[in-house]
């Protein structure tokens, strides 16, 4: 009999509820363990998901629980946040004064449960919170990572597909750096159907687009979504679900994520968005792209920005 795949979701707000639904509807989980401090909200989400299961193509068990119940999980997705803090601002750091104390509080509870799987963090500021979780959980390197620039890369893929008419599955690109305003697209590593962007641009005008404009669109995509509905849900939920699938199936697939750097790209002591090999042990390798000198300088600047923001941890 195949081993039952158990996934936990911590935080059942807009994002957490959509993560749970994505895991269920795609058949990624056999069992979902949902945790939230608001017991009535938790009960409501559990009931709603159970009501949906009968019409799903996969059998999924959904139950509410507390942090002690997370011990049985293969993967936990952390999505605790306070989205209302972002109203009137375009800076994910605004959430930091809420999310860091919250994470410090419940990370110890997750650790006390005996959890020994992989944790994927969504909570913002993603790179800083992911590092905080890794420090408190004490799991082996790679077993705690964040969605990071995974969602931003999806936005870039979408923009490139619309611009060129090439299906997004035939495009290779990454957003790197901070999951926030300090990120960039290394254009030298972008390819379509296996050929570099510059090769295409030399022969087809569709590929002679304004690269700065598309990068800006990718960075600002979340705020376009937020401005009309005051949350983001579908994109980040499917990003996290894709990463969970990669872990459960030991895919060894390259995906952009917030990973610990210990010398890669000449950086250390922080988490940042980089291409990673993701498998059963979480981030199993940080892929070092052959960046140009200009792109290397840009990445270092992004990392300096993350370090600067980490200084605020001393005040929390």
Identify the function of each model-found stretch.
Residues 136-143, 152-316:
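C-terminal substrate-binding/catalytic lobe of Rossmann-fold NAD(P)-dependent dehydrogenases
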Residues 12-13:
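Glycine-rich Rossmann-fold phosphate-binding loop(s) that bind the pyrophosphate
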Residues 25-31, 138-141:
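Conserved S-adenosyl-L-methionine
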Residues 90-157:
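Rossmann-like NAD(P)(H) cofactor-binding subdomain of soluble oxidoreductases
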Residues 37-74, 307-316:
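Conserved N-terminal Rossmann-fold NAD(P) cofactor-binding segment
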Residues 53-75, 79-90, 98-114:
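A structured beta-alpha segment of the ubiquitous adenosine-cofactor-binding alpha/beta core
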Residues 8-9, 34:
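Hydrophobic Val/Ile/Leu positions in short beta-strands of Rossmann-like dinucleotide-binding domains
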Residues 16-17:
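N-terminal Rossmann-fold NAD(P) dinucleotide-binding loop
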């Amino acid at each position: 009999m195949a081993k039952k795949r158990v996934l936990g979701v911590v935080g059942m707000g807009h994002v957490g509820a959509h993560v749970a639904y994505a895991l269920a509807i795609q058949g990624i989980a056999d069992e979902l363990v949902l945790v939230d401090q608001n017991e009535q909200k938790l009960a409501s989400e559990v009931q709603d998901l159970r009501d949906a299961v009968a019409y799903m193509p996969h059998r999924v068990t959904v139950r509410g629980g507390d942090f002690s119940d997370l011990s049985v999980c293969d993967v936990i997705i952390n999505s605790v946040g306070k989205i209302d803090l972002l109203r009137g601002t375009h800076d994910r750091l605004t959430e930091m004064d809420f999310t860091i104390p919250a994470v410090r509080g419940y990370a110890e509870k997750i650790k006390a449960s005996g959890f020994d799987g992989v944790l994927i963090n969504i909570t913002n500021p993603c790179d800083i919170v992911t590092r905080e979780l890794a420090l408190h959980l004490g799991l082996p390197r790679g077993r705690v990572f964040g969605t990071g620039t995974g969602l931003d890369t999806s936005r870039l893929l979408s923009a490139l597909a619309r611009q060129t008419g090439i299906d997004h599955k035939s495009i290779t690109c990454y957003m790197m750096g901070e999951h926030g305003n300090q990120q960039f697209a290394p254009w030298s590593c972008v390819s379509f159907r296996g050929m570099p962007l510059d090769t295409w641009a030399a022969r087809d005008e569709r590929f002679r687009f304004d690269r700065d404009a598309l990068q800006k669109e990718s960075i600002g995509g979340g705020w376009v979504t937020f401005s009309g509905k005051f949350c983001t849900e579908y994109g980040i939920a499917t990003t996290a679900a894709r990463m969970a699938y990669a872990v459960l199936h030991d895919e060894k697939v390259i995906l952009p994520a917030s990973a610990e750097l210990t010398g890669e790209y000449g950086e250390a002591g922080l988490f940042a968005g980089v291409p990673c090999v993701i498998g059963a042990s979480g981030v199993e390798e940080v892929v070092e792209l052959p960046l140009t000198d200009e792109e290397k300088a840009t990445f270092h600047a992004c990392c300096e920005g993350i370090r600067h923001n980490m200084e605020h941890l001393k005040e929390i």
